[in-house]
Design a protein with these regions (language model features):
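A short, Lys/Arg-rich alpha-helix, primarily the initiator
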Residues: 1-24
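Residue-level detection of the helix-turn-helix DNA-binding "recognition helix"
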Residues: 12, 26, 37, 70
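Key DNA-contact positions within bacterial/archaeal DNA-binding proteins
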Residues: 19, 30, 63
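Short, basic interhelical loop/turn and adjoining N-cap
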Residues: 27-33
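Short, charged recognition helix plus adjacent turn
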Residues: 34, 56, 63-72
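Short, basic-rich loop-to-helix N-cap that marks the start of a DNA-contacting helix
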Residues: 40-56
């Protein structure tokens, strides 16, 4: 599962728009579209501080957001 897949999963499970997601984590909606799009040129990583913010805001594991696996 890619970073784009994980972010799209969070957005889908929260039943919110990408605009709402971007507002709640404090980044531009364009950046969220870049991260979640299907382009081969999309970013494949995000800064740990953004992953932590997403984890706190939406209740997901920070490690899962960053790497696709949870720390046991």
């Amino acid at each position: 599962m890619t970073l784009a897949d994980r972010l799209n999963q969070i957005i889908d499970e929260q039943n919110i728009s990408k605009a709402e997601f971007s507002r709640r984590v404090g980044v531009s909606v364009n950046y969220i579209y870049q991260l979640t799009g299907s382009s081969e040129k999309r970013p494949t990583t995000i800064h740990q501080s953004l992953a932590k913010l997403i984890a706190l805001e939406f209740g997901y594991d920070e490690n899962w957001i960053l790497h696709g696996k949870k720390v046991e």
